[in-house]
């Protein structure tokens, strides 16, 4: 039996539960960040925030559905944002359901159209470290993913 086979046997139920936990934590974090007014939505808006104050950004969500796979410009933006986040120790995840993300965050005046939800940044509301349990859970999830060379893990949001 190879190491991959042993790992595959042990981690299938664990990884499913881990993924569901991360999805629920992301849902909670998005709602909490929106309530506190520390959520930035949109690729260009996020790039501006990352350029001006990267030390204040705590988490990044990249969202793209199947219809966005052919959008070369969006993929280039994602690559640049991922590189910037990795360089500045900002945890980052991918979500494959932009419509579900729009339902959680809401496409209000702040977010604009659902097309503006391809990148979401969560910032600290003030100078003090933000102690959100969902953020801590997601940071641990990202750290565990990086330990197995999954630098931008994908998360499925709960229904």
UniProtKB/Swiss-Prot annotation:
Claim: NADP is one of the keywords in the record: no
Gene Ontology annotations of biological process type: apoptotic process; cell differentiation; positive regulation of apoptotic process; positive regulation of cold-induced thermogenesis; positive regulation of JNK cascade; positive regulation of p38MAPK cascade; regulation of cell cycle
Result, substituting residue 80 to E: 30-fold reduction in homodimerization affinity and 90% decrease in growth inhibition activity and ability to stop cell cycle
Effect of residue 76 to E: 30-fold reduction in homodimerization affinity and 90% decrease in growth inhibition activity and ability to stop cell cycle
Key word Cell inner membrane present: no
Effect caused by changing residue 83 to R: 30-fold reduction in homodimerization affinity and 90% decrease in growth inhibition activity and ability to stop cell cycle
Mutagenesis or variant effect for residue 47 to R: 30-fold reduction in homodimerization affinity and 90% decrease in growth inhibition activity and ability to stop cell cycle
Alphabetically ordered keywords of this record: Apoptosis, Developmental protein, Differentiation
Protein task: Involved in the regulation of growth and apoptosis. Mediates activation of stress-responsive MTK1/MEKK4 MAPKKK.
PANTHER family with a match to the protein in the record: GROWTH ARREST AND DNA DAMAGE-INDUCIBLE PROTEIN GADD45, GROWTH ARREST AND DNA DAMAGE-INDUCIBLE PROTEIN GADD45 GAMMA
Membership in a protein family: Belongs to the GADD45 family.
Protein name, as recorded: Growth arrest and DNA damage-inducible protein GADD45 gamma
Organism: Homo sapiens (Human)
């Amino acid at each position: 039996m190879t190491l991959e086979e042993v790992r595959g046997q042990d981690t299938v139920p664990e990884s499913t539960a881990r993924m569901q936990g991360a999805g629920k934590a992301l849902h909670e974090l998005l709602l909490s960040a929106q309530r506190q007014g520390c959520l930035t939505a949109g690729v260009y808006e996020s790039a501006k925030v990352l350029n001006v104050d990267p030390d204040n950004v705590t988490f990044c969500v990249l969202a793209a559905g199947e219809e966005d796979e052919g959008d070369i410009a969006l993929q280039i933006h994602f690559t640049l944002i991922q590189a910037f986040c990795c360089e500045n120790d900002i945890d980052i995840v991918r979500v494959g359901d932009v419509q579900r993300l729009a339902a959680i965050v809401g496409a209000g005046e702040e977010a604009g159209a659902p097309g503006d939800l391809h990148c979401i940044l969560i910032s600290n509301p003030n100078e003090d470290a933000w102690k959100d349990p969902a953020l801590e859970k997601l940071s641990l999830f990202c750290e565990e993913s990086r330990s197995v060379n999954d630098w931008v893990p994908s998360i499925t949001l709960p229904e």
